[in-house]
Amino acid sequence: MSSKQATSPFACAADGEDAMTQDLTSREKEEGSDQHVASHLPLHPIMHNKPHSEELPTLVNTIQQDADWDSVLSSQQRMESENNKLCSLYSFRNTSTSPHKPDEGSRDREIMTSVTFGTPERRKGSLADVVDTLKQKKLEEMTRTEQEDPSCMEKLLSKDWKEKMERLNTSELLGEIKGTPESLAEKERQLSTMITQLISLREQLLAAHDEQKKLAASQIEKQRQQMDLARQQQEQIARQQQQLLQQQHKINLLQQQIQVQGHMPPLMIPIFPHDQRTLAAAAAAQQGFLFPPGITYKPGDNYPVQFIPSTMAAAAASGLSPLQLQQLYAAQLASMQVSPGAKMPSTPQPPNTAGTVSPTGIKNEKRGTSPVTQVKDEAAAQPLNLSSRPKTAEPVKSPTSPTQNLFPASKTSPVNLPNKSSIPSPIGGSLGRGSSLDILSSLNSPALFGDQDTVMKAIQEARKMREQIQREQQQQQPHGVDGKLSSINNMGLNNCRNEKERTRFENLGPQLTGKSNEDGKLGPGVIDLTRPEDAEGSKAMNGSAAKLQQYYCWPTGGATVAEARVYRDARGRASSEPHIKRPMNAFMVWAKDERRKILQAFPDMHNSNISKILGSRWKSMSNQEKQPYYEEQARLSKIHLEKYPNYKYKPRPKRTCIVDGKKLRIGEYKQLMRSRRQEMRQFFTVGQQPQIPITTGTGVVYPGAITMATTTPSPQMTSDCSSTSASPEPSLPVIQSTYGMKTDGGSLAGNEMINGEDEMEMYDDYEDDPKSDYSSENEAPEAVSAN
């Protein structure tokens, strides 16, 4: 080492100095105005003798003062470039085999210092070289320090990096929070939408709350109204109960009066259950609908007889209807009649010799004891047949009638009262306005006594009498009208009490003459029950003739016979033309057996209700179920067409009814009667009525309760006609139609079933059914009924 120092150290130094000089000159030209050299020149004397431990903090402080990250990087790059230049300057040192030593370094520094201070130019270049050398050393030391303690630089860099990253993150976050104008507008729109929805929700809640309040208030109001209504109903019920008690008290008083006035003769009025819809009691009473002695009668006058107070009070108290009150009145009058004929029921009354007798009266007297007189009471057991016109006048019952044993032989019995009657029976009703009621023929013997055999026997006898009458009429054809008036004697002509009454009866002949037909039949109001087709009508009432379906009329002044009766015109064919029944349709074929089944299960069911049941069943049936009946209909139609090739159906027009001057159809009339009955029921007691047993002269008791509404009766009825199947009303209308009565062909009164007999008749005569196109031509219309 010493040898090296001894051997030409300056030569090397000179060579190196020349190289350094050239290098510095070129560097000065390149960098020109580099400020780093000038800035570091004053530090050289101080830093030259300082140890490395003092130089590192100085460098660190210098680096820390640089706040900009880019300036730090640029300075590092410049230091690296200077380091490269210095490496070329001191490359000779790296060629030595010995490591660089500190003493050698110091010696070199001394040499360089001495050389540098030689001239100003060299001094300037030496200072720059020294600075570069120091920088290189510092970089080497920093590299070693970083390797020894890497956290130092990481701390330095991480602090600045973290600050920058924090600044970047904060700005981004602020940008996201602040947002763009579009996002802000969208958010504002969403907020406004939410506010609007909240406002609408609030309004809905308020409205629902108000509705709940209103609903609660309305419910409270309804409850209050219901409570008020219930209270009013209770008060009304209490008033009605009070009225019922008062009426019951009045009834009790009337019953006491009846008991006090017990000297009145008993009434022979059979009482029947109201649901049978019969007027048998009415017929029995009306046979005694007579006038007291001394009271004359003119056809245009009303009955001048007033009710007997005690009897009528008893009837009103017992719940009788207006018709039944009229019947009671008739029976009471009959019981008060006193005549010689009443005491001799088995012998004919002698002719009245007072006054002159017309030839008609003489002929009638000659036939006074004819067997024809037996017909009346037997035919009276049959219902009226309104669909046909009689061929003969209807005689009344004679005292010698074989059916007289059907009734008790009592002095006050209404059946025996025709013997003492001075008023004509239904035949007179067809001859003059002042006739008695034609309900005389509606007496229902089976309903009275339940003896159907007796009724059938009477029917057969009536047929025989009818044949005998026809034979006698054929013998008396030259006498004309005299033959038609053969039964006048039986109407009480010989029982007239004075000549004035006889004269009135004789004057009935011209009236009959004006209304008689050429074929020996009377006017349209006369019905002959002695004909087989008329008598067979009794079988139409469910086999027992328990339900009468005929019309009756009250005799009033100013009403003619034609107005007070049902009459029909011919349907385009002569009276002698035979009636051809229509073939049954499918419904009739099916209903034939079904109706029988229903009647077997419910014998008392009304025909209209049965028809409704059958109609609803038929509509509910399927076409497959109806097919066999349609086939049967086709077969029957084919047979009918072969039998009657020229048959043409001629329907009769609908019946009409005149009420208070208005022309009503039957359905309208029924509705009117219903409303009138309903109005009447509102004024009278409704409920259980006391039973009044009626005892006849022979001790026969007819128990039963009269449950019909009571009313104040009047003997003068203001209208002309009604139906026995409906409850009687004070105003009884006129039944009128535009077709005549049939002359032949058996028909059924009403539309009732025949208990297995003559179903074909029943179905042909079925008028009320919707399938009425297949009903019979000679059917009897269903009686006017509100039931």
Curated annotation (Swiss-Prot):
Keywords: Activator, Coiled coil, Cytoplasm, Developmental protein, Differentiation, DNA-binding, Isopeptide bond, Nucleus, Phosphoprotein, Repressor, Transcription, Transcription regulation, Ubl conjugation. There is a cross-link at residues 363, 376 (Glycyl lysine isopeptide (Lys-Gly) (interchain with G-Cter in SUMO)). Residues 352-361, 398-420, 712-740 have a biased composition (Polar residues). The modification Phosphoserine is found at residues 358, 398, 401. Its main location: nucleus. The keyword Repressor applies. It comes from the Eukaryota. GO terms for biological process: brain development; cartilage condensation; cartilage development; cell fate commitment; chondrocyte differentiation; positive regulation of chondrocyte differentiation; spinal cord oligodendrocyte cell differentiation. The keyword Repressor applies. Residues 755-768 have a biased composition (Acidic residues). InterPro entries: HMG_box_dom, HMG_box_dom_sf, SOX/SOX-like_TF. Residues 184-262 form a coiled coil. Transcription factor that plays a key role in several developmental processes, including neurogenesis, chondrocytes differentiation and cartilage formation. Specifically binds the 5'-AACAAT-3' DNA motif present in enhancers and super-enhancers and promotes expression of genes important for chondrogenesis. Required for overt chondrogenesis when condensed prechondrocytes differentiate into early stage chondrocytes: SOX5 and SOX6 cooperatively bind with SOX9 on active enhancers and super-enhancers associated with cartilage-specific genes, and thereby potentiate SOX9's ability to transactivate. This is Transcription factor SOX-6. It comes from Pongo abelii (Sumatran orangutan). The gene is SOX6.
